[in-house]
Each structure stands twice: as structure tokens, then as C-alpha cells.
Amino acid sequence: MAVSLRDTVKISEFINLSKQDEILPAFMTKVKSVRISTVDKIMAVKNDSLSDVDLLKGVKLVKNGYVCLAGLVVSGEWNLPDNCRGGVSVCIVDKRMKRSNEATLGAYHAPACKKNFSFKLIPNYSITSEDAEKNPWQVLVNIKGVAMEEGYCPLSLEFVSICVVHKNNVKKGLRERILRVTDDSPIELTEKVVEEFVDEVPMAVKLERFRKTKKGKKRKKEKKKRVVGNSVNNKKINNSGKKGLKVEEIEDNVSDDESIASSSTF
């Protein structure tokens, strides 16, 4: 039987629990459980896509508690023949954050000639159980230079996370372990550029543009509806006795105060 991505993940690579947390029953310690999520999968069909990803799939949460996203392992498989050109940038996003540079948890770049790849992130921050149920994470995928017909899937991505479920938001004993990564290691560091594939545009900038495009389309639809409504309501009958309609031009003072902070590279 083949080894799955979930089976290759070791909790000790991401966190150290105190002896107290390891020995004592769950009701006597702040840490309720340490879990490895089941694998969530995304098929990257479009060159640019922003998709929801369930990083806590299969994890039982505590009511009115917290969950710490201690670590994340992402595995990618190119569904292409050997020696194809192009590559991909993969970015993990916290969609709760409005500023794009703060929403990006980490990015990774891989060429298409590398048949498969894996990388890990250590977000190491907690959110409430209520927020976790809203599935707050996304993945931004930017495939560049891969010549494939539309409708086919050049890349498959799998995600598995290590998380700590706790009743109180206290991080004592949840220390992050920094690992040394060598050339022979199967898992590589965040933002490491492999071979000669270099992404010219930072992923935070890509996320900002992607969000602006979505908001721009939404505003355009709303503006069109408003213009159609005004053209009907602004027509009034001329009281001078002459035939015809008098059209009053009413200035639209609705302004969009929404501002998006400019993103910067990190």
C-alpha cells in the first residue's frame, strides 16, 4: 500500500509539548489534543485561481475554544510529460485579513520540470473555534508558462496540517522548532526558489490584484443597476403645457470610501 502524505507528517517536526501536556489527561491540561488533519485536495485547472482549502479537515474542535495552526505540509504533483517548461507559485492565504501582505502566510515556487514537490510552513498562530468553522484559509495558485489547452488539469495539490486544540489561548509549551534543511531533505523551506524558476511578481501583489479584480466587477454591476434606476426615476412631466418630457439630471453623490492598503513584499 502506498504511503500517503498524512502518514509522512510527524508532529515532533513542528511542535514540542511539555512533559506535563504529554502525560496528564486532557481535562488536567490546557492542551486538549494535537491533531493531524485529513488530506484536502485541489485540482489547479486555471492559470490563476484563489480557492478555499480546508486545513482543519477531520479535526474535532472545542466549543468556545481555540485551535493553533502549528504546521502545514503542501505536496504538489505535475500532471505533465517530462521536461515541460513553466512553473507555479503557490501561496497560502488567511482570507480574514484585508491587507494582502498580511494575509499571505507563505509562498513557494516550483518549476514544471520538477515532477513533484513538497514544502512546509509553520504559521504557529491560533484562531477561535468559531472562526475555524468558517474555513478562513485559501490557496492562491499562479501557473505560468505551461502551454496546455483549457479544461485540463496540469497540477494537483494536497494539504495536511498539524494543529493543537485548546480551551484557553495560552501558548506555553507550544514552542516552534526550527529545523535545518539540507539538499537531501524531501521537504524544503518556504520561499526557496528551486532550480532557475524565478517569479518576478510577489504573491502578495498577485493577491491584491486578484481581490481588486473581483471587487471591480462587483462595483461595475452595482453601478449599472443604479444608472438604470436613475434614468427612470429622474424623468418628470413638464408643467409648461408643452408636449414631451423634461429630464432632470441629478448628480450622484455616492462615493466609494473603501480603501485598500498598498501591499509590499515581505
From Swiss-Prot:
GO biological processes: transport of virus in host, cell to cell
Major localisation: host cell
A Gene Ontology molecular function term of the record: RNA binding
Pfam families: MP (PF01107)
Keyword list, A-Z: Host cell junction, Host cytoplasm, Host cytoskeleton, RNA-binding, Transport, Viral movement protein
Compositionally biased tracts (Low complexity): 228-242
RNA-binding keyword on record: yes
Span list, region Disordered: 212-266
Listed Acidic residues bias regions: 249-259
Annotated compartments: Host cytoplasm, Host cytoskeleton; Host cell junction, Host plasmodesma
Gene Ontology CC terms, in alphabetical order: host cell cytoplasm; host cell plasmodesma; host cytoskeleton
Highest taxon, organism lineage: Viruses
Family membership noted in the UniProt record: Belongs to the tobamovirus movement protein family.
Summary of the function given for this chain in its UniProt record: Transports viral genome to neighboring plant cells directly through plasmosdesmata, without any budding. The movement protein allows efficient cell to cell propagation, by bypassing the host cell wall barrier. Forms a ribonucleoprotein complex with viral RNA. Binds microtubules and modulates microtubule stability. Can bind double-stranded DNA.
Protein name per its UniProtKB record: Movement protein
Organism this protein belongs to: Tobacco mild green mosaic virus (TMGMV)
